[in-house]
Amino acid sequence: WGDGNPEGVRQRAAEEMKNTARAARRFFNAAPPEIKQQLTRIVVNGFTGSSIWQYLYAFPPTPPDLIERGFQDFATRWKPILDVFEQEDVYFALEVHPTEIAFDIVTAERAIEAVNGHPRFGFNYDPSHLGYQGVDYVAFIRRFRDRIFHMHVKDVWWSSVPRLSGVFGGHLNFGDSRRYWDFRSPGRGCINFEEIIRALNEIGYRGPLSVEWEDNGMDREHGAREACQFVRQLDFEPSRLSFEAAFER
């Protein structure tokens, strides 16, 4: 695999991803029937990496063809991986995240285009990586309604007034009071989870509401209990009847 050689390591990582799809299929096949019935699809969450992650901030000016080559490189490496996911009837969900090939709505659309709309490529929806950037995180759900394969209930706080550091964090550790934004226990940040649940119900999402918890200012065990209670209170089934239909005899 050319250990120590970057390209050899990339090839080994690609094979690892293919084997992950195969393993996910085998885990599903071995699961009890009651577990299988709860799953709408088999999903592997993860990151794709990006050969252009260092150009997140477009200065010095970044030539458009350099960015295009980055998306082409992503497609060249990931289409064969996604083909194995298709063979195994498994879906790959990229967590849209700064320094990944997709980090907002525009780059998520471009990533889909790069792999020619591959049916096994979609997203692990995590609003905490979108809100503080200024991205419309509820619109993301509706925009990619057929590609939301998984989601994280993860909250983030961002300031309503200027701070000593900005979106890029000022090289400050998480939990530092000088930050412009920071992760919070679900329900204690700025994310509007009410609108998220309504949008997920609207698109027919039936997957898990998976808590990813980070909060430097809170005890973890307290946070785990609180997050569980928050999600149970938050979630609800969509209406099966329109408002107008309720008046029909």
Where are these regions (language model features)?
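Active-site acidic/histidine proton-transfer and metal-coordination neighborhood
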Residues: 1-123, 221
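A short, acidic, flexible beta-alpha connecting loop/helix-capping segment that sits on the rim
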Residues: 210-219
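Flexible loop residues that form catalytic
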Residues: 49, 156, 213-214
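A short, acidic, amphipathic alpha-helical segment used as a generic capping/interface helix at domain edges
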Residues: 188-202
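Short, acidic/polar
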Residues: 12-23, 133-142, 193-196
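Acidic/histidine-rich catalytic cores of soluble enzymes
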Residues: 68-190, 239, 243, 247
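C-terminal helical cap(s) of enzyme catalytic domains, especially alpha/beta-barrels
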Residues: 220-240, 247
